[in-house]
């Protein structure tokens, strides 16, 4: 996820505009909280908030889709190519964040299923 951003910085391109930082900050906080919640559930094996976490991740992905479409519209309306590299880096960040959420959701579902199947097998052995 960070490779295009690192390349962008290493090549001395312009930094992201403050407006993009401001737009992305609540997304970053929300994704960090989702990752923390997912980690807690997987590491403790306690899945009481499982459905809420998946629903929140879906909502975040939907919001990212809107932001991405809005950004694509901004790119199409902009005149000139001065900011194209910065715009592409930001677009990539939005897309990779969506992908991260998809992988996180998949990992949470798989971990829960693995635990439940293991408990089911232990129960059948005990019977």
Task: Name what the model sees in each region.
Residues 1-127:
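Cytosolic, long alpha-helical scaffolding segments
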């Amino acid at each position: 996820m960070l490779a295009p951003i690192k390349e962008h910085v290493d090549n001395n391109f312009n930094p992201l505009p403050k407006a993009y930082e401001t737009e992305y900050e609540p997304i970053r906080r929300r994704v960090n909280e989702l990752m923390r919640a997912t980690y807690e559930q997987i590491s403790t094996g306690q899945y009481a908030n499982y459905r809420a976490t998946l629903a929140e991740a879906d909502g975040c992905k939907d919001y990212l889709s809107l932001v991405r479409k809005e950004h694509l519209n901004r790119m199409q309306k902009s005149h000139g190519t001065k900011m194209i590299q910065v715009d592409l880096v930001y677009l990539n960040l939005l897309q990779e964040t969506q992908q991260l959420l998809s992988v996180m959701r998949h990992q949470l579902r798989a971990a829960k299923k693995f635990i439940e199947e293991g408990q089911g097998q232990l129960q059948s052995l005990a019977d």
